Amino acid sequence: MKRTNYAGNITEEYLNQTVTVKGWVAKRRNLGGLIFIDLRDREGIVQIVVNPETAAADVAEAADKARNEFVLEVTGKVVERASKNDKIKTGGIEIEATAIEILSTSKTTPFEIKDDVEVLDDTRLKYRYLDLRRPEMLKNITMRHATTRSIREYLDGAGFIDVETPFLNKSTPEGARDYLVPSRVNKGEFYALPQSPQLMKQLLMTAGLDRYYQIVKCFRDEDLRGDRQPEFTQVDLETSFLSEEEIQDLTEELIAKVMKDVKGIDVTLPFPRMKYDDAMNFYGSDKPDTRFELLLTDLSALAKTIDFKVFQEAEVVKAIVVKDAADKYSRKSIDKLTEQAKQNGAKGLAWVKFEKGEFAGGVSKFLAESTDSFVNELKLTDNDLVLFVADSLDVANSALGALRLTIGKQQGLIDFRQFNFLWVIDWPMFEWSDEEERYMSAHHPFTLPTKETQAFLSADGHSKDSDLKKVRAHAYDIVLNGYELGGGSLRINTRQLQEEMLSALGFKLEDANEQFGFLLEALDYGFPPHGGLALGLDRFVMLLAGKDNIREVIAFPKNNKASDPMTQAPSIVAEKQLEELSIKLANKDQ
C-alpha cells in the first residue's frame, strides 16, 4: 500500500483516521498479551499496538515475528494513547494495526540503534548506514540540508549564479598537498583534485558573471583532526566591483538568515571587527574565542626589571590571570599545563599564586620585591593564579592562547549556548615558514596587498627580518566560537602586481608562467576588481549542531587515517589498472 504519512509526524489531528506507515522496528515489547512496536522513520517514532486476541491472525503473526530493525509496513487506525509520552511528537497517539507486512528482516546489529550508546568510532564508520539511523545523526544530516537550503535561498535572491567548476585541475604549489589523479590518455601526467575553486572562480569574474557561488567538494591531503577531513565542502563565493566591507556585509546577511532559519536565533549585525595583531596579542590566536575573557597581558617592561634571568633574556614575557582559581590548581595540574605549553613551542611555564596579599609557589621568590607592581599591572585579587610564558612573541602568544582555551573549559568560563561571530581583519600578507626558511602567503598568492604596503613586495623573502613582514593584505576571516568559519580577500586584478606577488614568493618569471600562465594571460584582458570568500560548510553545521567533530555532520566521512572502514578505501588496485596508467609502485616500506 502507499504510505500516507511519516511515522514521526502523526499527531492527535489524525485521531480516528486510517494511516499507512513504513519504517524500522526500534523496539518491540509483549506486555500482558498486547504487543507494542515502536516504528521509526526519518521523522521520528510512532507506537503500534496489536492485540493478538482481536487482531487478524496474519497481523498477530507478523507482530510476533517482528524484531529490532525489521522493516515493516503498518496500516491501522490512529487512537488516543492511554499512557502519554510528552517527550516525543507522537506521544499522544498510537496506531491500532489492522495490517502488518514484513518488508525486510534484519540480523542483530553490531550496536543498538539509539543515541545513548557507546560505540567505537571505527565501528560507527564501518556500519555508517546503521549509525545514520540513530535519531541524533538523522537530525544532524537534516540540519545540514536545512543549512544548504537557506544558503541557496539567500544567494539566489541576491543575484548569485551557481556555476560548477572542474574537479580535474592542474596541480599548483603554495597550498596543502594535492590529491593527484593520473591521466591514462596523457601518460606520465597528472590532474589534481581542487583544494578550492580559487582560480576558476576568479576567471568567472573576468568572464562577466559578476556574482558566482557554488557549494562544492574540495580536497586536501593533510593531517587530520576533529575539524578536518580529506574531502570537505565549502560555500564558495566571488563577486566583482564590491569593496571589502560590502563583501563582509553580504556574508553577514547570509549567516544571519541561516541562523534564523536553522536555529531560530536572531544575530546582531554588524559582526565585531578585530585586527589580526589584536587577536594574536590578546587571545593568542588568529581565530579568537570571544565567549570568555582570560586575555593575554604583555608584562615585558615590568618583568625585565626583576632579577630573573628567564624573564630578562626573553623577547617578551606574557601572562594570563585565572581569577579566583589558585586553590583549584595543584602542582600536578599545573605540570599538565606546562606540558601543553611545551607542546606549543614554549620552553616552560612560570607561575605564581596570589594568596593573602603575597605571591606563593612557582617563581614567587623572584617577584617578591615587585609584588605591588605586578598586582597593579595584572589587577590581581586574592586566590588568583598567574601563568607566564617568556619566549619569542609568536611562541608566547601560541602557548598562552592554547592554555587559555584549556583553562576556559576547565573553569566553566564558556557559555556553550552562545554563537559569537567576528571578523579578523588587517592580516599580514605573508607568514614565515621555519620548514621552508622563507615567507609564504598567509592566505594565497592572489590576495590583494594594501596600496600602502605594496612597495615592500620587492624585499627578499628568505630572511625572517625581511620587509615582506610589513606587507598587509585586504584579507578577512570570519570566526565563530574559536573556529575559522571561512576566509576571503580582495584579489589582484593586474598582471604586473600578480607577477610582483609571485616574485616575492620566490617564483621566477618562467616558473610563474609554467604554473599560473593561464591566469596571468587572463589578467591582460580586462579583469575587473573582485573579491570573495569561502565558508566551511562542514564546520558551520558542526557548530550549529553543537558537535566537536565534523564527522558528526557528514554522511560518509573518513577516519583519522583518511580511510573509510566501510568501503575499505583507499585500497590496492589491479596491476592491469596500473599498467594502463603507466604507473609502477615502489616498495611501500621504503
UniProtKB/Swiss-Prot annotation:
The keyword Cell wall biogenesis/degradation does not apply. One of its GO terms (cellular component) is cytoplasm. GO terms for biological process: aspartyl-tRNA aminoacylation. It is found in: Cytoplasm. ATP binds at R220, D221, E222, Q229, E484, G536, L537, D538, R539. One of its GO terms (molecular function) is aspartate-tRNA ligase activity. Its EC number is 6.1.1.12. L-aspartate binds at E174, R220, H443, R491. Its main location: cytoplasm. PROSITE patterns: AA_TRNA_LIGASE_II (PS50862). It catalyses: tRNA(Asp) + L-aspartate + ATP = L-aspartyl-tRNA(Asp) + AMP + diphosphate. The keyword Transferase does not apply. Residues 198-201 are annotated as: Aspartate. Transmembrane segments: none annotated. Keywords: Aminoacyl-tRNA synthetase, ATP-binding, Cytoplasm, Ligase, Nucleotide-binding, Protein biosynthesis. Pfam families: GAD (PF02938), tRNA-synt_2 (PF00152), tRNA_anti-codon (PF01336). Catalyzes the attachment of L-aspartate to tRNA(Asp) in a two-step reaction: L-aspartate is first activated by ATP to form Asp-AMP and then transferred to the acceptor end of tRNA(Asp). Homodimer. This is Aspartate--tRNA ligase.
